[in-house]
């Protein structure tokens, strides 16, 4: 009996001692306005414990006591806060206030990790600063590296998403949709993107299943938010930068007071140095210049005024001289030589402006009136004659000699004005948004194009009088239309299940549902688009998120899709088809996110499966970046695939990722099933950053792309003849940068905050990627597809000054 009593006493003492070594930490995480922050991360690295705050900002952790316990609180867009508990016992309560992180230049300083709870993924812009890029458009280059996104032209900022065309991607800046030039047909003509990376605060991007607020496009949504500078005292905040490279120069300056934020940027780009590496030699004179300003004025907590102004003047002048291209197989190499006369002169002038007034009625309710105006005047003019020779390389046998002449006088003017009334209201677990907008569209086009060759494209005996017109088009059109759009959506965040003893083990749900409607008086069509998405963070699996989305998406027709053609006496006439209907895509998406740590580095693995049922499609062909539509709803189809992405700190303090995309697309046209023109069966992208051992002043950035080639056929043929596929797109860009000065962490500040030097090797392995094909016919009538290659290996030097 005494032995039993002794054993019981020892066990009781041991239990009490063990209980004394544990304690419970609970509390709440809020922002500066005392609003709860849901899904904030509370972690104790020394004990490997992590908790995610509830919808009310509450958290609870069971921890082991020690002399000191370090607790870290982090949330996307907010400064990370660390608290140290000294010999904690029993129950500890800790309420933490997180403050918004300041932003500098084009960098979003984020230490925490946001849990994706919808179909919009947030991209960090800090890696754009010294990343190698041939097109100079940092945001689009970042988007092109994402899973499900592809590009086959390093000179272009355009991209395809899950089998969609370039025109199926919507872009918003501060809740206002922006437009791209209409007449651009090649990456060489493209200038600077309207998105200015120096002004960007947040980037949201979705490859499908996005909410009702994101317009009538059926492939992707890119949501850009510009930053504002705010002084903490009466002393103004000033920041700026100067950047220069062999491809252009940029200047940026920002001013912030307690009420006013004013950002300004001037950018200049020239690609003549880069284009000099192409096979077509000549005098390239591309010059692109733009200016952008963003003014935000908030006199008090109730009112806010925002203005964005943008002017862009892009010139592309080109006088070709000659080219020589070798193509074919190792056993059968052919040579294609051309000597040119003539020139091309293009100009793209664009004005864009937005004005927004916001009334904040309460902390949870606001009403905004947004107005915007877009104007573009574009001209494309060229007269180019080429005399070509097609030869067998080994035997020197001449397969064809000919002359061709290409002529174009294309003029287009477009004006789009819009007004939008937007209401946002938050009540308990609901975050609602509704808007109605009116658009006025006016477009005028006057185009003449033709191409002719002697002797039907090859040299044979003839009477000297006949010229064969390969292609001839005339278009004189005017569009005047009004478009009305409206949407309403709600984001409902709630928790389910029974909480455990910590009060924190519940399943978290984020449900977004909404409906969108629009009417266009040109074709008198009304479309309605319901959309739904759900994200689940399971109890006891807080590092896992399951995502599901479905919705009906329409591609509302605009000017390009309207152009229908008819041929009379060998001349093709383009007119606007008033009977055209919106293309339709039904999205079904299932996604999986898993967050984990290896050592001290954070990683995230994401996977998505999708299926898109396509209907009312308007067939189109792609040459370079020019998309030509058939102008009629003629086919249906599908796109299905898998996207994988591994993201994290492969090297401490840096962000890197690897993505893999697998896809299958088909459309049924003329009773035949064929791939979509953007069918890319596989794509692999790698973005990797690293520091030199022992020094963070030296940094390396590497971009790798390996993607399947796209289907193609001879020009001016039916799409059913798309029986060929281009070679795979393979490219590697590497950049090395050295931080000459880093004054950001010094107590005594100087005028210059950061100085960085860099050198890039673009197309590191010198791979000849095919952009498009030029078709030549020999004396036997056999056609040859002569590849038009993109840029070769080239070096670029850069310098960046920040103050």
Question: Where do the PLM segments sit?
Answer:
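Periplasmic N-terminal accessory/gating domains of Gram-negative outer-membrane beta-barrel systems
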Residues: 79, 86, 92, 115-169, ...
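Membrane-embedded beta-barrel scaffold of Gram-negative outer-membrane proteins
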Residues: 366-372, 579-633, 638, 757-762, ...
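C-terminal beta-signal and adjacent terminal beta-strands/loops
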Residues: 653-656, 705-713, 738-803
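Transmembrane beta-barrel wall of Gram-negative outer-membrane proteins
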Residues: 238-268, 281-319, 344-369, 373
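Surface-exposed extracellular loop regions of Gram-negative outer-membrane beta-barrel proteins
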Residues: 273, 321-326, 539-588, 609-629, ...
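Gram-negative outer-membrane beta-barrel transporters
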Residues: 493-496, 610-613, 630-713
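Short, acidic, small-residue-rich periplasmic hinge/interaction motif at the N-terminus
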Residues: 30-33, 40-45, 72-79, 88-132, ...
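Face-selective signature of the C-terminal outer-membrane beta-barrel domain
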Residues: 298-314, 343-523, 606-609, 657
């Amino acid at each position: 009996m005494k032995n039993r009593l002794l054993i019981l006493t020892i066990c009781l003492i041991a239990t009490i001692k063990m209980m004394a070594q544990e304690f419970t930490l609970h509390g709440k995480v809020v922002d500066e306005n005392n609003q709860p922050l849901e899904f904030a991360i509370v972690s104790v690295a020394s004990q490997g414990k992590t908790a995610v705050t509830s919808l009310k900002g509450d958290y609870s952790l069971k921890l082991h006591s020690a002399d000191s316990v370090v607790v870290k609180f982090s949330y996307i867009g907010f400064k990370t806060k660390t608290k140290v508990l000294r010999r904690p016992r029993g129950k500890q309560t800790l309420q933490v206030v997180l403050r918004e992180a300041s932003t500098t230049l084009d960098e979003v300083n984020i230490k925490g990790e946001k849990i994706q709870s919808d179909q919009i993924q947030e991209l960090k812009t800090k890696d754009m600063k010294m990343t190698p890029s041939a097109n100079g458009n940092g945001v689009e280059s970042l988007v092109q590296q994402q899973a499900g996104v592809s590009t086959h032209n390093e000179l272009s900022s355009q991209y395809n998403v899950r089998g969609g065309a370039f025109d199926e991607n919507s872009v918003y800046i501060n809740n206002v949709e922006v437009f791209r030039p209409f007449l651009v047909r090649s990456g060489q003509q493209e200038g600077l993107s309207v998105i200015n990376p120096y002004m960007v605060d947040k980037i949201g991007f979705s490859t499908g299943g996005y909410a009702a607020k994101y317009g009538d496009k059926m492939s992707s949504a890119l949501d850009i938010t510009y930053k504002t500078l705010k002084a903490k005292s009466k002393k103004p905040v000033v920041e700026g930068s100067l950047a220069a490279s062999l491809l252009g120069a940029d200047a940026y300056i920002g001013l912030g007071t307690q009420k006013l934020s004013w950002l300004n940027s001037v950018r200049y780009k020239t690609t003549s140095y880069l284009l000099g590496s192409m096979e077509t030699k000549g005098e390239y004179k591309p010059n692109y210049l733009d200016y952008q300003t963003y003014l935000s004025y908030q006199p008090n907590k109730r009112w806010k005024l925002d203005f964005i102004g943008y002017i862009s003047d892009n010139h592309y002048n080109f006088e070709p001289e000659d080219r020589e291209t070798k193509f074919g197989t190792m056993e059968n190499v052919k040579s294609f030589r051309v000597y040119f006369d003539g020139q091309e002169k293009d100009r793209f002038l664009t004005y864009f402006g937005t004005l927004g007034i916001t009334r904040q009625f309460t902390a949870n309710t606001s009403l905004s009136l947004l107005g915007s105006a877009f104007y573009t005047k574009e001209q494309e003019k060229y007269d180019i004659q080429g005399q070509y020779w097609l030869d067998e390389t080994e035997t020197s046998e001449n397969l064809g000699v000919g002359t061709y002449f290409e002529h174009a006088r294309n003029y287009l003017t477009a004006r789009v004005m819009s007004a939008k009334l937007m209401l946002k209201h938050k009540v308990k677990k609901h975050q609602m948004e509704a808007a109605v907008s009116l658009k006025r569209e006016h477009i005028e086009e006057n185009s003449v194009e033709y191409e002719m060759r002697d002797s039907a494209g090859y040299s044979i005996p003839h009477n000297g009088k006949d010229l064969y017109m390969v292609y001839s088009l005339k278009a004189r059109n005017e569009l005047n239309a009004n478009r009305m759009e409206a949407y309403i959506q709600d984001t409902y965040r709630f928790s389910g299940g029974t909480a455990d003893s910590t009060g924190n083990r519940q399943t978290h749900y984020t449900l977004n549902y909404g409906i969108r409607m629009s009417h266009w008086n040109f074709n008198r069509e009304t479309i309605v688009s319901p959309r739904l998405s759900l994200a689940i963070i399971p109890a006891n699996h807080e590092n896992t998120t399951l995502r599901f989305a479905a919705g009906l998406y329409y591609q509302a027709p605009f000017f390009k899709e309207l152009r229908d053609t008819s041929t009379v006496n060998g001349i093709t006439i383009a007119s606007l088809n008033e009977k055209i209907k919106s293309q339709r895509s039904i999205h079904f998406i299932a996604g999986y996110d898993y967050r984990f740590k290896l050592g001290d580095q954070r990683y995230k693995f994401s996977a998505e499966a999708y299926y898109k049922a396509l209907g009312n499609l308007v067939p189109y062909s792609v040459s370079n970046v020019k998309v030509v539509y058939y102008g009629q709803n003629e086919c249906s189809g599908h796109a299905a695939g898998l996207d994988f992405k591994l993201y994290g700190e492969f090297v401490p303090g840096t962000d890197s990722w690897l993505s893999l995309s697998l896809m299958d697309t088909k459309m049924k046209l003329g009773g035949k099933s064929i791939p979509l023109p953007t069918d890319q069966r596989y794509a692999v992208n790698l973005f990797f950053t690293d520091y030199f051992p022992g020094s963070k002043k030296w940094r390396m950035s590497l971009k790798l792309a390996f993607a399947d080639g796209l289907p193609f056929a001879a020009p001016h043929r039916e799409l059913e003849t798309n029986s060929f596929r281009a070679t795979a797109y393979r490219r590697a860009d590497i950049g090395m940068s050295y931080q000459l000065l880093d004054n950001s962490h010094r107590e005594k500040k100087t005028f210059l905050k950061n100085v960085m030097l860099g050198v890039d090797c673009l197309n590191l392995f010198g791979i000849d990627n095919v952009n498009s094909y030029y078709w030549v016919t020999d004396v036997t009538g056999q056609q040859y597809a002569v590849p038009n290659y993109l840029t070769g290996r080239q070096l670029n030097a850069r310098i960046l000054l920040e103050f």
